[in-house]
Amino acid sequence: MPKRKDIQKIMVIGSGPIIIGQAAEFDYAGTQACLALKEEGYKVILVNSNPATIMTDKEIADKVYIEPLTLEFVNRIIRKERPDAILPTLGGQTGLNMAMALSKAGILDDLEIELLGTKLSAIDQAEDRDLFKQLMQELDQPIPESTIVKTVDEAVTFARDIGYPVIVRPAFTLGGTGGGICSSEEELCEITENGLKLSPVTQCLIERSIAGFKEIEYEVMRDSADNALVVCNMENFDPVGIHTGDSIVFAPTQTLSDIENQMLRDASLKIIRALKIEGGCNVQLALDPYSFKYYVIEVNPRVSRSSALASKATGYPIAKLAAKIAVGLTLDEMINPITGTTYAMFEPTLDYVVAKIPRFPFDKFEHGERQLGTQMKATGEVMAIGRNLEESLLKACRSLEIGVCHNEMTSLSNISDEELVTKVIKAQDDRLFYLSEAIRRGYSIEELESLTKIDLFFLDKLLHIVEIEQDLQMHVEHLESLKKAKRYGFSDQKIAEIWQKDESDIRAMRHSHSLYPVYKMVDTCAAEFDAKTPYFYSTYELENESVQSNKESILVLGSGPIRIGQGVEFDYATVHSVKAIQKAGYEAIIMNSNPETVSTDFSVSDKLYFEPLTFEDVMNVIDLEQPKGVIVQFGGQTAINLAQALSEAGVTILGTQVEDLDRAEDRDLFEKALKELGIPQPQGQTATNEEEALEAAKKIGFPVLVRPSYVLGGRAMEIVENKEDLREYIRTAVKASPEHPILVDSYIFGKECEVDAISDGKSVLIPGIMEHIERAGVHSGDSMAVYPPQQLSKQIQETIAEYTKRLAIGLNCIGMMNVQFVIKNDQVYVIEVNPRASRTVPFLSKVPGIPMAQIATKLILGQPLKDLGYEDGLYPQSQLVHIKAPVFSFTKLAQVDSLLGPEMKSTGEVMGSDTSLEKALYKAFEANNSHLSEFGQIVFTIADDSKAEALSLARRFKAIGYQIMATQGTAAYFAEQGLSACLVGKIGDAANDIPTLVRHGHVQAIVNTVGIKRTADKDGQMIRSSAIEQGVPLFTALDTAKAMLTVLESRCFNIEAI
């Protein structure tokens, strides 16, 4: 069927900020979709609130709106642009929910706008738990016994009838938000109450638990002519009961018989046809391990996290083809871009094994609830490809960047058998490592299977890895043992550990016996047809399919899995760097391990190596490709941490040199450089042990800011105000980076701002200064940033620009650099310098319109700044005001304290832009879902050192119609100053303590601060948790509350009696 000619203009709805459950996979899908629609000649209008994405670049769509994804703003854009159709299925749950909201508000009917791809009725049938149940019954597809409830009492009655455990699944939520497995009535009441609040339609499905069944996924596609195919089938290592986003997943399925595969395949195709889905769809099924009995768990009628994984696992571009199907093209008339000869109707075949392992944030949130269930907790994921399961699993383990190079954590060797068995049964994020430890201790795989319900096939593979370890122990420096270990994915580092050698010895031994990896192509057809893709993975076999070209090449290292502190912003910079390399006439090679991102789309670079970002794996690619050099600036700390070892191995690092990277990271060298350049910094010292740290703090004076060097995202950073706290910090946190000393700095409570700069070593371009709304003490990634600065004098801005230029030239910076400043009493101090791309690059690239990563890459490749048409110094400021606001995922992370501090906690960001600060702030708050009513009750519970400042805020809140409530100490202080506040009860005083008031909807906002001593009491954490659980706006920094107040005041009319 030819593409539709009756529509010209299509709006694509993006997925908004990155949160747990909805990450970079939608940037990848949205980018593909917009480009595919443009390729077909349609005019594309994109709306998304996330500036950190490739998708929101001007060239991706004809018009790009970075605006809040709320009905208010999307409606305005629709009325302005008048699109003929909207494509909502590539914007995750956000896109689908927006489509439903537009329909319910009558906007689509009113403006005669069509929804493309999946119809509203299909979205409703798949997402509405009741309609889905009816459809499955009509299709004769088995689903677990279940009921739809709108109250807690209904849930309790049903559970009493069918027995526990039961699963709660709220309707229209993402990543299992609000759901869970309940083993008792108490758990059921708690989870259902929360689930009903989080469901936009106040509806939960309560179903019989089928935990322990195998969890299987089918990624399917269908077009308007009813052609349908399975792109990829996947099997979860973990049985049903753990969210698929938190499970280790293998593709293709590993343990199914042909009969089982055909049965589930037929069911998936039957469902997509019945729903009349046009595009991509994900079907999740549960299979009884002991019979042919199965259940349909759920259907996602859209492109999803699994679609991104399936696309990267097979090379089949699901989102691109889904967009083309949405405008009428059919699978049998579209060419598969991988082979260039077969049609998209041809089902991919894999002759390799793909492993996906989730990346969790518990290295940052040590007190978070780590037990896994039906609510997703991972922030990102890694993928690895191998010729056998062991190889792909071990490559994925070392891609995680959690300090392991194997499926082994050495710290587990000290735990008791009792603790080991508990951790094996109660699945946490690190269960794989406990299982492997149990096998090393001699537990049988049959015992482990009965404890975990993980299939014996997978446990046998873990046993095989342990057997290879034992073989290596018995045959030190034995060539055949080395070959076998390499064939099954062992790293040089692990083999060196077992043989008690250096990693370099293993590398030398391999090379002396010509034992090199070969690179195989991902071609969708198991080599049945010639493929055109430059998409490769390594393995230890004979035939190498990756041929070095005659063109000079540059290798760009990606940033690995998305985690807190290192998000999609770095992928953005990587993709732009590749574009500049190609424009400069070089072959651009990317190496990365993240299946969610645009950088791992094979069409972005000239060659893509889907490999772990370790010294060994990077060197193997360098040995084959012999690039002119390697760029490490755009891959975050992941790539920077490899620079030293690569340089020592004789690799050319392009851009800022390793010794200069060291001068920025090494405290003593940095201090020396600042003195030479005449730039002030907070007084500070380095310390390598407890005595030195205490001595430094005594000399500097408390409070001090302590942190390890060479970390990203404020990892293990803390403000301490006495010796006891400092001793506690040294004992617990120095582990964060044991081979490097810790930094002890004077803590200056002033205004923070940051700058990104681009330098060729002689000239320095500063795209802009970003002023932080929150004062020092809140991590820059968690602060709201304003561009251009609103409260910095011209003189201070000139000083910042001057210091930045001095630093860039003094540190021989070639490419990018990020500098953070604190200002107190008109004195500008440098806090830190990062000689690489930072997380603000996408925001600052979009706002003044400077393609920062591309310019930086051109300078790295040797072009002078002046030849690119840019002047030295600060770039002219934008006429609009732009706000970058953080987005948090606390609702998914039980027991993680939402108190903001020097360690980063946000998972994503949004942007608000307008003609005034107040309007831009309003948009930013709307975009990050901090919607505050115009009046109501606000609770203040304030630390002594900020009560005076909080008083003036409380007075302003009262003036616009808010009723002030406060805890005992705060209320007493307010009363002394002439402001009466309603007293709230102590925690535990059930009638009117804050959690109770919050639960009953009597509180519209909470302002809660703690003193500089950040070990906040339990009561404070309970207050903050109750606000997060009930979705009540919570401010733990007075500056953020002040910003919100500014917005509310600007929207208030003055009402006075005459």
Swiss-Prot record:
PROSITE patterns: ATP_GRASP, CPSASE_1, CPSASE_2, MGS
Residues binding Mg(2+) 4, per UniProt: E832, N834
GO-annotated cellular components: cytoplasm
Domain (ATP-grasp): residue spans on this chain: 133-327, 671-861
Organism, scientific name: Streptococcus pyogenes serotype M49 (strain NZ131)
Protein name: Carbamoyl phosphate synthase large chain
HAMAP family to which the protein is assigned, alphabetical: CPSase_L_chain_A, CPSase_L_chain_B
Binding site for Mn(2+) 3: Q820, E832
Location of the MGS-like domain: 930-1058
NCBIfam families: CPSaseII_lrg (TIGR01369), PRK05294.1 (NF003671), PRK12815.1 (NF009455)
Lineage: Bacteria, Bacillati, Bacillota, Bacilli, Lactobacillales
Family membership: Belongs to the CarB family.
Entry domain remark: The large subunit is composed of 2 ATP-grasp domains that are involved in binding the 2 ATP molecules needed for carbamoyl phosphate synthesis. The N-terminal ATP-grasp domain (referred to as the carboxyphosphate synthetic component) catalyzes the ATP-dependent phosphorylation of hydrogencarbonate to carboxyphosphate and the subsequent nucleophilic attack by ammonia to form a carbamate intermediate.
Residues holding ATP 1: R129, R169, G175, G176, R208, I210, E215, G241, I242, H243, Q284, E298
Biological process per Gene Ontology, one example term: L-arginine biosynthetic process
Gene for this chain: carB
Positions that bind Mn(2+) 4: E832, N834
Annotated EC: 6.3.4.16, 6.3.5.5
Cofactor stoichiometry and binding remark: Binds 4 Mg(2+) or Mn(2+) ions per subunit.
Biochemical pathway: Amino-acid biosynthesis; L-arginine biosynthesis; carbamoyl phosphate from bicarbonate: step 1/1; Pyrimidine metabolism; UMP biosynthesis via de novo pathway; (S)-dihydroorotate from bicarbonate: step 1/3
Binding site for Mg(2+) 3: Q820, E832
Residue sites binding Mg(2+) 2 per the record: E298, N300
Region of interest (Carbamoyl phosphate synthetic domain), residue spans: 547-929
Pfam families: CPSase_L_D2, CPSase_L_D3, MGS
UniProt cofactor(s): Mg(2+); Mn(2+)
Protein keywords: Amino-acid biosynthesis, Arginine biosynthesis, ATP-binding, Ligase, Magnesium, Manganese, Metal-binding, Nucleotide-binding, Pyrimidine biosynthesis, Repeat
Chain spans, region Oligomerization domain: 402-546
Function: Large subunit of the glutamine-dependent carbamoyl phosphate synthetase (CPSase). CPSase catalyzes the formation of carbamoyl phosphate from the ammonia moiety of glutamine, carbonate, and phosphate donated by ATP, constituting the first step of 2 biosynthetic pathways, one leading to arginine and/or urea and the other to pyrimidine nucleotides.
Signal peptide: none
